[in-house]
């Protein structure tokens, strides 16, 4: 029985070998597919964009230059803004200081009228009448003089200075000429007479002195 089975197996082997032999058509198809795949990869490789190193460097350099220009422009704007801010701060500070210094000039002008009245009052009193023989007039005169001195001290304390330019060179910024007259022995262009004293507040003319100016004969 076993010998019979062996003989049958030997007879079947050639047929089985033929059945498992690959078909030439299938082999050809597989080869074509493989070749097509390789060709496709090659085509895709050819389609990939190629980057020129020199072109990339040029682009980066242009971007660098552009960014540097933008940075420079921004810094210039920043510096100008800082300068404008500093100028504004200084102007504001100056305005505040001037307001402190000259904010009282309206009040000072009103007080000048009082000082003028006191000065005229003391000048109107005859000096020969001020004696012990007239104690009431003497006391009144001395009170006026003390008041005038005190008010001038207050003026000086607050930066208000008296301008009495007799004999000084005429200054159009501090003096106002009422007339011109020749005066013997006086230099032309100098102040010969002060009709009304002037005042300056912290170096700024608050009221010009009213004067008569010497002219050539």
From Swiss-Prot:
Q: Per its record, what are the GO molecular function terms?
A: adenyl-nucleotide exchange factor activity; ATPase activator activity; ATPase binding; identical protein binding; protein homodimerization activity; protein-folding chaperone binding; unfolded protein binding
**In terms of one coarse class, where is the protein primarily found?**
mitochondrion
Q: In which tissues is it expressed?
A: Ubiquitous. Particularly abundant in heart, kidney and liver.
Task: Report the residues modified as N6-acetyllysine.
Answer: 94, 100, 215
> Where are the N6-succinyllysine residues found in this chain?
94, 120, 215
Record has Transit peptide as a keyword: yes
Q: Does the keyword Chaperone apply?
A: yes
Q: Where is the transit peptide?
A: 1-27
Instruction: Extract the CDD domains matched here.
Output: GrpE (cd00446)
Q: Name one GO biological process term.
A: protein import into mitochondrial matrix
HAMAP family from the entry?
Answer: GrpE
What protein family does this chain belong to? Belongs to the GrpE family.
Q: What is this protein called?
A: GrpE protein homolog 1, mitochondrial
Whose protein is this, by species? Rattus norvegicus (Rat)
State the taxonomy lineage.
Eukaryota, Metazoa, Chordata, Craniata, Vertebrata
- The gene from which this protein is expressed is Grpel1
């Amino acid at each position: 029985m076993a010998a019979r089975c062996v003989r049958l197996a030997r007879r079947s082997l050639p047929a089985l070998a033929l059945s498992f032999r690959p078909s030439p058509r299938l082999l050809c198809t597989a080869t074509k597919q493989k070749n097509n795949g390789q060709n496709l990869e090659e085509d895709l490789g050819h389609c990939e964009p190629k980057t020129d190193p020199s072109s990339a460097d040029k682009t980066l350099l242009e971007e660098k230059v552009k960014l540097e220009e933008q940075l420079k422009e921004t810094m210039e704007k920043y510096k100008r803004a800082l300068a404008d801010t500093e100028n504004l701060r200084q102007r504001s500070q100056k305005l505040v200081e001037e307001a402190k210094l000259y904010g009282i000039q309206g009040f000072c002008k009103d007080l000048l009228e009082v000082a003028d009245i006191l000065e005229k009052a003391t000048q109107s009193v005859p000096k020969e009448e001020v004696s012990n023989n007239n104690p009431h007039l003497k006391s009144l005169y001395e009170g006026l003089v003390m008041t005038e001195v005190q008010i001038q001290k207050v003026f000086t304390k607050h930066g208000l200075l008296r301008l009495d330019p007799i004999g000084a060179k005429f200054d159009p910024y501090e003096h106002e000429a009422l007339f011109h007259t020749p005066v013997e022995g006086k230099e032309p262009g100098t102040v010969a007479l002060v009709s009304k004293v002037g005042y300056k507040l912290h170096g700024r003319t608050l009221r010009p002195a009213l004067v008569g100016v010497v002219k050539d004969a």
